[in-house]
Amino acid sequence: MATFKEHLQERSAHSIGRVNAHGYEDSNFLLTKLTENKMSCPMTISMLAPTLGTVGRINEESRTRRNAGYPINFEFDFGPVIEFLNMRLNNAGDPFMECNYGIHSKKFEIAVLDWFARLWELPKDQYWGYVTSGGTEGNMHGLLVGRELFPEGIIYTSCDSHYSIFKAAKMYRVQCIKIDTLFSGEMDYADFRRKLLQNTRSPAIVNVNIGTTMKGAVDDLDEVVMILENCGFANRFYIHCDSALVGLMMPFIKQAPKLTFKKPIGSICISGHKFIGCPIPCGVLITRLMDINHVMSTNIEYISSNDTTIAGSRNGHAPIFLWYALKRIGYNGLCKTVENCLKNAQYLALRLREMGVSVFLNALSITVVFERPNDETFVRKWQLACQGKIAHVVVMPNVSLERINMFLEEFTKSRIALHQDKCVAGDVSQENCLCSLHLDRKKEAV
């Protein structure tokens, strides 16, 4: 029986174009044709190799080692599946439908989707989903389904939401109401209730953050549902959960609130290149099949598939990498990894506080928020994500205790050299601010 790889090779061989003995398009042939073009750049492989080698060394030795501000997991080794990059995989159209283009990885994609549907407790015959290009596309799709179900609806989302939520509202020309947040980054539920009551005639399309971008705050899904029902929106709301980073972690944290389709939510999306560490930017969206069948089931004859996704042509390599990562680490591995990240985040927050740095860490979060360093060279060196007066470190699996201690040592030297004393009470609360003003007030209170 032919393997999946052999099956793809056979399909590739029947595609129009020149193929080699392995069934792949001949890259040397393509390169020759490219360089024969008089308008092409006269660069040879020998000229290109040193440049690529230098870039690779820089990325590996300095960038990768000191990436602290952005949630990327560098721990996974995808060597065993790298050779699939030689294949021209395109998961065009609906993942559950065979399309006319036969070189795809939809079987892997469905396996990944099944895994997440089980994780979030949506039965196999009731879910639909696909592997997206990332969290932004997942948010765009979730909100689009909400808009199609409730054309007159208003989008409600907190001020701390990812910028893609506001982008989607603008693209779809849907009114978007921003909800105030607490200093923690969590939605201000009193403000949410107040703004709902000002617009009772229009259905509510609500984005619930399961881990905000800057502070890792988790909105209370149960509280949001209760407020919607108490304000007269029963059966007139759609909830999308932006779970880019934390959505994969929460099911493995015993004390965490449950993220499940047993609650009245419409869709959940995560990023595949963050906690899982897929080397290709991607994501996963899971939603309810009945909603897709109701609002997004137009058939496209050209590809012999339904138009249910945002993108037409979709990356066929990402599902293979996601499948491999999930199979390799497993449920037990994810439990241990999540637990270790939480412990390391608490360690970093404690050490920063001992250094006299204003710091804040949400419960059950791996995003450590602290005063923005004045040294921009240090910020760039550690690739810190900054916003106003604050910065953060996202303690991913590759951010080990060794790297945390290295970061702390360099940050200490930087602060001493620049005599940093910054008030960030407005961002982390007076209780967590350790500037000279608030330290003096605390001493006076004692």
Curated annotation (Swiss-Prot):
<comment type="function">
    <text>Catalyzes the biosynthesis of ethanolamine from serine. Decarboxylation of free serine is the major source of ethanolamine production in plants and ethanolamine metabolism is crucial for the synthesis of choline, phosphatidylethanolamine (PE) and phosphatidylcholine (PC), and thus for plant growth.</text>
</comment>
<comment type="similarity">
    <text>Belongs to the group II decarboxylase family.</text>
</comment>
<dbReference type="GO" id="GO:0102705">
    <property type="term" value="F:serine decarboxylase activity"/>
</dbReference>
<keyword id="KW-0210">Decarboxylase</keyword>
<dbReference type="GO" id="GO:0019752">
    <property type="term" value="P:carboxylic acid metabolic process"/>
</dbReference>
<dbReference type="GO" id="GO:0030170">
    <property type="term" value="F:pyridoxal phosphate binding"/>
</dbReference>
<dbReference type="InterPro" id="IPR051151">
    <property type="entry name" value="Group_II_Decarboxylase"/>
</dbReference>
<keyword id="KW-0663">Pyridoxal phosphate</keyword>
<dbReference type="InterPro" id="IPR002129">
    <property type="entry name" value="PyrdxlP-dep_de-COase"/>
</dbReference>
<keyword id="KW-0456">Lyase</keyword>
<dbReference type="InterPro" id="IPR015422">
    <property type="entry name" value="PyrdxlP-dep_Trfase_small"/>
</dbReference>
<dbReference type="InterPro" id="IPR015421">
    <property type="entry name" value="PyrdxlP-dep_Trfase_major"/>
</dbReference>
<dbReference type="InterPro" id="IPR015424">
    <property type="entry name" value="PyrdxlP-dep_Trfase"/>
</dbReference>
<feature type="modified residue" description="N6-(pyridoxal phosphate)lysine">
    <location>
        <position position="274"/>
    </location>
</feature>
<protein>
    <recommendedName>
        <fullName>Serine decarboxylase 3</fullName>
        <ecNumber>4.1.1.-</ecNumber>
    </recommendedName>
</protein>
<dbReference type="Pfam" id="PF00282">
    <property type="entry name" value="Pyridoxal_deC"/>
</dbReference>
<dbReference type="InterPro" id="IPR021115">
    <property type="entry name" value="Pyridoxal-P_BS"/>
</dbReference>
<feature type="binding site">
    <location>
        <position position="162"/>
    </location>
    <ligand>
        <name>substrate</name>
    </ligand>
</feature>
